[in-house]
Regions:
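Enzyme catalytic cores with a strong preference for nitrogen-chemistry domains
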Residues: 1-296, 307-308, 312-321, 348
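ATP-dependent adenylation/pyrophosphate-handling site
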Residues: 293-297, 301-343
Length: 352
C-alpha cells in the first residue's frame, strides 16, 4: 500500500487537515508520522505542526530489515542535510538535523527520531542532544512480543538519563489493523531516567506529564563532560508563541525526594548509605593503622549516625568496639531525654 499514489496523496491530505486544525490550538506543537515521496524515493517521516504551519519534516534514518520488519522494501533511509520541499504551498525544511525551537522559550528545543532509530548503537537523539535538544520526540510503531515492553521502557528511560533530556515516546496502537503484528500503544514520557507517565498497554490511552526543562538545563551545566557541538550543522526551525504562561502543575513533586516511600526500598537505601560511609571509614582506619576513634555524641540524629557508621567500620576491620570512645557534650539544647539516649546507645553498642 505504501507504493500506491492513493495512499500517499491521502497521507498528505491528512497532514494538511491537521495543519488547518492546529490553527484552533494556538501554542501547541504536534508531531505526525506519514510516508512521504520526494524525488522518486519514499521516506518514513515525522512532521512538526504548529499554529497552522508545517514547521519541518524529519526522515527516519535507520530502517529495520530483520525479523518481522522489512521497511527497506519500500522506504529509503533519511539524510542529515536540510533541503526544502513544497507541502500545500509551504516551503518546508526536510532533513534529520532539525531542531524545533520557540521564540519565547529558548530552553525548549525538540529533536525527533523515529522508532528503530532509538534501538541502534548510535541513535540520532545523541546528536540532537549534543546540539542542544532538551526534549526528544519519538513517533514509533513498536510491535509487541513477550517481554518487549520492559526492554522498551528501560531503553526510553535510559536514553533520557544518558542524554539528560525529556523523552516523549508515542507508539502505534490498535488502529494498525492491516498489519500482521500487534501494537499496544505503549506510550511513555521520561525525564533524566525517571518515568513520568506510562500508558496501559492495549488501552489506546493518551498520557501527559510536566517536563522540567529548567532542571534539564541546570543538570547539563553541572556536567563538565556535557559539551554542546560548537560546529553545529543543525537547522533550527523557530515557531512563534509557544505556550508560555503559568499552568497548574500535574506533576507530583515529593517533599522528601531522597527518602523512598516504599519501606523495602527505603531500607535498601539506608543500608547503602551506611555501607558507603562505613567502607570509606574502614579504608581510612586501615591506612592509618588506627584502632581508636573519639566521637562526640548528643543523642541527636547526626552523632547517632556517625556512631553507627564507626561501629560498622570497626566490625569490618575486626577491631574491638571498646576502641570507640563516646564523649557526651551537653549544651543548651541537651535534654535529659537526649542525654540518656546517648548513654544507652553507647552501652548497647559496646563502646567506651
Amino acid at each position: 500500500l505504501f507504493l500506491h499514489d492513493r495512499l500517499l496523496n491521502a497521507a498528505i491530505q491528512g497532514l494538511v487537515d491537521i495543519k488547518k486544525y492546529s490553527e484552533t490550538t494556538p501554542g501547541m506543537i504536534s508531531f505526525v508520522g506519514l510516508p512521504y515521496e520526494m524525488n522518486g524515493k519514499l521516506y518514513n517521516v515525522v512532521a512538526g505542526i504548529m499554529n497552522g504551519c508545517i514547521l519541518g519534516m524529519v526522515p527516519k534514518m535507520y530502517l529495520p530489515n530483520y525479523g518481522e520488519f522489512y521497511e527497506r522494501r519500500q522506504f529509503t533511509p533519511g539524510f542529515n542535510e536540510c533541503v526544502y520541499v513544497d507541502v500545500d504551498g509551504e516551503e518546508v525544511p526536510f532533513g534529520s538535523e532539525l531542531l524545533f525551537t520557540f521564540n519565547n522559550n529558548r530552553k525548549v528545543k525538540i529533536g525527533v527520531e523515529i522508532c528503530e532509530d532509538l534501538w541502534t548503537p548510535q541513535p540520532p537523539s545523541i546528536k540532537h542532544a549534543m546540539n542542544g535538544a532538551t526534549i526528544i520526540v519519538n513517533a514509533s510503531a513498536s510491535n509487541e512480543t513477550i517481554g518487549k515492553d520492559t526492554y522498551r521502557k528501560q531503553l526510553v528511560s535510559g536514553q533520557s538519563a544518558r542524554l539528560v533530556c525529556g523523552y516523549v515516546y508515542s507508539s502505534a496502537g490498535g488502529g494498525e489493523s492491516t498489519q500482521d503484528i500487534v501494537f499496544s500503544a505503549h506510550n511513555l514520557i521520561c525525564e533524566n531516567g525517571s518515568t513520568l507517565a506510562e500508558a496501559h498497554k492495549f488501552a489506546d490511552e493518551s498520557v501527559y506529564a510536566d517536563i522540567d526543562v529548567e532542571r534539564i538545563c541546570s543538570e547539563r551545566r553541572r556536567m563538565s563532560t556535557y559539551a554542546v557541538d560548537e560546529n553545529s550543522t543543525y537547522t533550527e526551525v523557530q515557531a512563534q508563541n509557544f505556550i508560555n504562561k503559568e499552568l497548574e502543575l500535574i506533576r507530583y513533586f515529593d517533599k522528601a525526594p531522597f527518602v523512598p516511600s516504599d519501606k523495602k526500598e527505603r531500607d535498601s537505601r539506608c543500608e547503602e548509605i551506611l555501607n558507603i560511609q562505613s567502607y570509606g571509614l574502614k579504608k581510612r582506619l586501615e591506612h592509618t593503622n588506627c584502632k581508636n576513634a573519639v566521637i562526640g555524641i548528643s543523642g541527636g540524629l547526626d552523632s547517632t549516625l556517625a556512631l553507627l557508621v564507626t561501629v560498622r567500620a570497626f566490625d569490618l576491620c575486626g577491631f574491638d568496639r571498646s576502641g570507640i570512645h563516646c564523649i557526651t557534650m551537653p549544651c543548651f539544647g541537651t535534654t535529659d531525654r537526649t542525654y540518656n539516649n546517648a548513654v544507652k546507645l553507647t552501652k548497647q553498642l559496646g563502646c567506651s
